[in-house]
UniProtKB/Swiss-Prot annotation:
One example GO MF annotation: oxidoreductase activity, acting on the CH-NH group of donors
GO CC terms: mitochondrion
UniProt keywords, alphabetically: FAD, Flavoprotein, Oxidoreductase, Proline metabolism
Organism annotation: Xenopus laevis
UniProt xrefs under Pfam families: Pro_dh
Taxonomy of the source species: Eukaryota, Metazoa, Chordata, Craniata, Vertebrata
Enzyme Commission number, as recorded: 1.5.5.3, 1.5.5.2
Protein name (record): Hydroxyproline dehydrogenase
Known function: Dehydrogenase that converts trans-4-L-hydroxyproline to delta-1-pyrroline-3-hydroxy-5-carboxylate (Hyp) using a quinone as the terminal electron acceptor. Can also use proline as a substrate but with a very much lower efficiency. Does not react with other diastereomers of Hyp: trans-4-D-hydroxyproline and cis-4-L-hydroxyproline.
Pathway assigned in UniProt: Amino-acid degradation; L-proline degradation into L-glutamate; L-glutamate from L-proline: step 1/2
Gene: prodh2
Length: 466
């Protein structure tokens, strides 16, 4: 498969989020009883869900989560891994990584390894969501188109792998693997000016995707050429995914490029989402404007007659976003505290669930969260609204190697639950894992409950307890 050998690539812990105790007036006694039954059937405190894991997997998870609870280890992980590689040599270092951190959080490198991971998840009632860990930030721009063209081939392979992974396949996509971050930032700056609205719109991007040699006056000749190449790459991937019935979840990234990402994603939706939501966008609820952005995009999709899919997350770039806002002197885009983020998440969650309750064919949602209260709230509202947990209109998502007590419980209860599966070589994936660990330190330090459940399960096995 194209370039598979070369590259063969997470939300938050249970904290203090609140589940609204009162039910909407519209809820009938039947829906109230169904909600209570649905919530009562789920227990995230039962370590028995780990019975399907091997003792090695339980011990490895316990050790890694314990290590991740030390901020200094996470902060200096890149330097320590670099030293380890020099001392051990490539082969021994890779062997150690595959038995530890890489093995915990990555699906594998080769096609057989990925298939083993996917098959194991399916036995546990969990669906795979493949993710290629390739992205670009400012200052990392590549010269020419070759790197982006190679990434297109890798993404097309990811579509094929996802399609072969079973029913209702999903995959993640980072636009900055196919379009430079510098161009995304430039487009985002121009999108902030209302006068550029008529020029920079989904329709104009679609026309370029379909072959029109358009050029924007605020872009140089080289930038216009790169834009044309980039959106056509994205169009080819979107159409290939739609033809293979693979849902593509476009990841959000940093606020200084997100407007451009949403513009291009809406253009992809315009091409593919007439009858079903094949292309989805991601909304980061730790941003103060996340609900208004979701509402605006819903209105745009409705005006274009499009189906709409949403990946709902809290967000992973908080520290960098706050640091940038201080450096550049603009308002902090992040919610002022954790509770505000929780309220934002629940507000967007309720909006999408209400729409799905009205028409689950045209609206889809993945509750991409490690937060137990958010998951329980979604389960409760699904029951109240009569949303069939097996219909596919609502699913749940967590990262591979994390929050397994939630994923396994949901899967065994018949809910559609996905694990985000990065895959690739140790060299290609480790930078991604290091970045995510550093960006999600608060998550990694807060997984005490999962550590306790793993410790209890390991103790049960060691002492042969029932």
């Amino acid at each position: 498969m194209r370039l598979l050998g070369r590259y063969l690539r997470l939300g938050s812990p249970r904290l203090c989020s609140r589940v609204w105790p009162t039910l909407p007036p519209s809820c009938s006694p039947h829906s109230t009883a169904a909600a209570a039954q649905a919530q009562g059937a789920l227990s995230f405190s039962d370590g028995g869900v780990f019975k399907l894991k091997s003792s090695w997997e339980v011990a490895r998870g316990l050790l890694i989560f314990r290590m991740c609870s030390f901020p200094s280890l996470v902060k200096h992980s890149e330097k320590m891994l670099s030293v380890s590689r020099r001392l051990l040599g490539r082969r021994l270092f890779e062997w150690g990584m595959k038995g530890s951190v890489y093995g915990q959080f990555v699906a594998g490198e080769t096609l057989p390894e990925i298939r083993v991971c996917v098959d194991r998840l399916r036995q546990l009632g969990i669906h795979p969501m493949l993710a290629v860990p390739i992205e670009e930030d400012l200052g990392q721009a590549k010269s020419g188109e070759r790197w982006y063209e190679q990434n297109e081939s890798i993404m097309l392979d990811c579509v094929d792998l996802s399609a072969a992974g079973g029913d209702r396949p999903m995959m993640q996509l980072k636009i900055t693997a196919l379009m430079s971050a510098e161009l995304c930032k430039l487009l985002s700056v121009h999108l902030s000016h209302p006068s550029n609205g008529p020029q920079l719109c989904p329709r104009s991007i679609v026309s370029i995707m379909e072959g029109k040699e358009s050029a924007f006056s605020f872009l140089s000749e080289g930038e216009n050429s790169h834009l044309r190449n980039s959106v056509r790459r994205l169009s080819r991937i979107a159409k290939h995914a739609t033809a293979n019935r693979v849902r593509v979840l476009v990841d959000a990234e940093y606020t200084y490029m997100n407007p451009a990402l949403s513009l291009v994603t809406m253009a992809m939706m315009s091409q593919c989402n007439q009858s079903e939501p094949w292309i989805w966008n991601t909304y980061q609820c730790y941003l103060k404007d996340s609900f208004s952005l979701l509402s605006l995009d819903l209105d745009t999709a409705r005006s274009l007659g499009l189906c709409f899919g949403v990946k709902l997350v809290r967000g992973a770039y908080m520290d960098k976003e706050r640091k940038l806002s201080k450096q550049k002197g603009y308002a902090d885009p992040i919610q002022h505290d954790w509770e505000a983020t929780n309220r934002s998440y629940q507000r967007s969650l309720d909006k999408m669930l209400d729409l799905i309750g009205q028409n689950g064919q045209r609206h889809n949602l993945i509750v991409a969260s490690h937060n137990e209260e958010s998951v329980l709230h979604a389960v409760t509202r699904m029951a109240e609204l009569g949303i069939d947990k097996g219909s596919g209109s609502v699913s749940f998502g967590q990262l591979l190697g994390m929050c397994d007590h939630v994923s396994l419980t949901l899967g065994q209860a018949g809910y559609l639950v996905y694990k985000s599966l990065p895959y690739g070589s140790v060299d290609s994936v480790l930078p991604y894992l290091i970045r995510r660990a550093q960006e999600n330190q608060s998550v990694l330090q807060g997984i005490r409950k999962e550590r306790d459940l793993l410790r209890r399960e390991l103790k049960r096995r060691l002492f042969n307890q029932r």
